Swiss-Prot record:
Residues 136-148, 158-176 have a biased composition (Low complexity). InterPro entries: DNA-bd_dom_put_sf, EF-G-like_DII, IF2_assoc_dom_bac, IF2_II, IF2_N, P-loop_NTPase, Small_GTP-bd, T_Tr_GTP-bd_dom. GTP binds at residues 355-362, 401-405, 455-458. One of the essential components for the initiation of protein synthesis. Protects formylmethionyl-tRNA from spontaneous hydrolysis and promotes its binding to the 30S ribosomal subunits. Also involved in the hydrolysis of GTP during the formation of the 70S ribosomal complex. GO terms for cellular component: cytosol. Residues 380-384 are annotated as: G2. The gene is infB. Residues 355-362 are annotated as: G1. Residues 346-513 form the tr-type G domain. This is Translation initiation factor IF-2. Residues 455-458 are annotated as: G4. SUPFAM superfamilies: Initiation factor IF2/eIF5b, domain 3, P-loop containing nucleoside triphosphate hydrolases, Putative DNA-binding domain, Translation proteins. It comes from the Bacteria.
Amino acid sequence: MTQVTVKELAQEVEAPVERLLQQMREAGLPHTDAGQVVTDNEKQTLLTHLKSSHKSKAEEPRKITLQRKTTSTLRVAGSKSISVEVRKKKVFVQRSPEEIQAEQKRELEERRAAENAARDKVEAEVRQRNEEQARRQAAGSTAAAPAPAAKPEPAPAAAPVAAPAPVVADAPASEDAAARAAERKKDETRRNESRTRDDDRRRGEAPRVSIKVKVKEKEKAPTPRAAPRTTDEESDGARRGRGGKSKLKKRNQHGFQNPTGPVIRDVTIGETITVSELANQMSVKGAEVVKFMFKMGTPVTINQVLDQETAQLIAEELGHKVTLVSDTALEDSLAESLKFEGQTESRAPVVTVMGHVDHGKTSLLDYIRRAKVAAGEAGGITQHIGAYHVETDRGMVTFLDTPGHAAFTQMRARGAKATDIVILVVAADDGVMPQTREAVQHAKAAGVPLVVAVNKIDKPGADLDRIRNELSVEGVTSEDWGGDTPFVKVSAKMGTGVDELLEAVLLQAEILELTATPTAPGRGVVVESRLDKGRGPVATILVQDGTLRQGDMVLCGSNYGRVRAMLDENGKPVKEAGPSIPVEILGLDGTPEAGDELSVVADEKKAREVALFRQGKYREVKLARAHAGKLENIFETMGQEEKKTLNIVLKTDVRGSLEALQGSLGGLGNDEVQVRVIGGGVGGITESDANLALASNAVLFGFNVRADAGARKIVEQEGLDMRYYNVIYDIIEDVKKALTGMLGSDVRENILGVAEVRDVFRSPKFGAIAGCMVIEGTVYRNRPIRVLRDDVVIFEGELESLRRFKDDASEVRSGMECGIGVKSYNDVKVGDKIEVFEKVQVARTL
């Protein structure tokens, strides 16, 4: 057993020697010097003493303080708020069990003493009250005893009668005094009882003595004056408590009763309805409808849109009456209110000029109008629809000039719908092109007759028969070949054949017998719309029927307004416009979509109601289409990487150009990159457009528009990419280049040379060295290689050493021998092939 001195023990426990000796003396050990030996038993004794002393200190009462802080916000008028902080502090003191027991014992003794004192006092009061009552009864019996004895006595005997007279007179006075004393004692008793009850309630015990005394008091103390008061109190308490409460309950009871049978509701179902709306109309919970449809085998959610037939089936199965309504009921009622009555008259034909780009459509129309309009278009290319009416020698004709570029498919389709006759312009030296075929398809779909104008007939190489052959393939047969389509040879530059073309157009118009009602309210179609900075929304309208006048309230798609001003195609103000007349109108609350129908309505309230309805319907259709697209593509996009997206904010001068550019740009891209037009509109580039581009990391494109000062400032500060264009080709080409750059590059491997192993040598520096013959290409040093055995790749690494004879070589050409050392590979065998290649990055294209 190892012996330890006091000094060594002090060093071990890291305590001063004097303190350790003092603790050992307190523990009863005989150690007084630092050199004395301490045994294990003495160590145990010292440890026990220290533990007991620490425990006694730990068991002393300790005070615990808890602080709690609560912060809340108090809102005052406006957007102001006040922060309220509540701090609470609680102190807990742990007391010894002896103190707690002593306090409980003391409280119990005090409670018992108070109960005994209250009981003695109450018993004394009851005893005194009983004695007074007995004395009062005795006095009453003494006063009543002489009254019957006075009747048989004769009248002269006055002395016996006079003796009890004072007693009879004093009886009521003593009775009143006794009643007052009893009343005072009763009040005092009631106060004592209430105090006793409060004490019992505070101590948590039931007032047993008070209840017994109270019962006795009610039974034994029916005093004459206290009884009416008690009755009043009881009746008043009953009136205020029980009676009043019951009457109040009766007044507050509702007359609703649960239905004894199923309630049949009248359910109105439109063309589409959500599950929650259907449940609300049937007065059931949405979960019940969802559960019912699950039982029918159709899993739905509470916000899912149901068609009319499904909703009708559900409502009828649940026992309700169904009323089907059309979503277009509001528009139908508006159409019925519009009356087109009056005498019909012949109207001018609306002619649309179609054809491929640069085939001379605008130049031909320009020659007809005797004005140089094409010079105003960028690059001589029509960017949006132009509407003009022309007075010719043979009558008035309205022309619509549509763009020929591939991006303007929707604009050409709208032009075909709004027109009566289509002039198909085909260049004699170019033939039938893609947009020519598309124009033929639009004309056939709209059921509009065609007049073919073979333009540029004065150029060398013009071949009319070739045009006839190519168009006959598309189903357009010339009159010379037995068809019904007139072919006219024209030259927009020289004016050749223009008169014959107009004659053919007017002949077709006479065959169609075009009529209109000028006296009816105006009705037309939106050819184009734009946002003018000074005049607001401007819409180009082609009046198809009736007369449009300044001041009319019009409904145009999802927009409405009063016509504040009308301008003709030359910019001159006009008061009214008849059938087949194109005009620009001002006063709408927004820019309508090209192709929207315009109607004159009599009531502004009705116009606003229908416009708001159409806006909501358009929003619902858009959301439904987006939801359907997500459901259809959920499995196709599962597991695919996220596409790289080029965000664009696009602003144009007219609505048609915006739609065309959105369609063209949206069609660009592939599985890896895409174009997303996050913001588009008509008008100049504003500060909000620049902020949108900044927030979404987009490129700003302006087509025939410019940015204002606020937008330019943001573009300069943030370094945004903003570009101006006036030709649609440039936008599409730049976006294609940007997408090509986003695609990155591909890594392509080019095989530089192949060497065949003829022998294997051992080198102390490089290990196995392959003696090879270059059989193809050139072998280079420090290039990646592959080792092929039986045309199977068994190793891929790097060519570390290349020598010819004893000299290092940078390259060895075909037909020459060399020694090749492969880095980190020694399993080279005779007959293997070493293939040297390089990796080249190649730019990708769309």
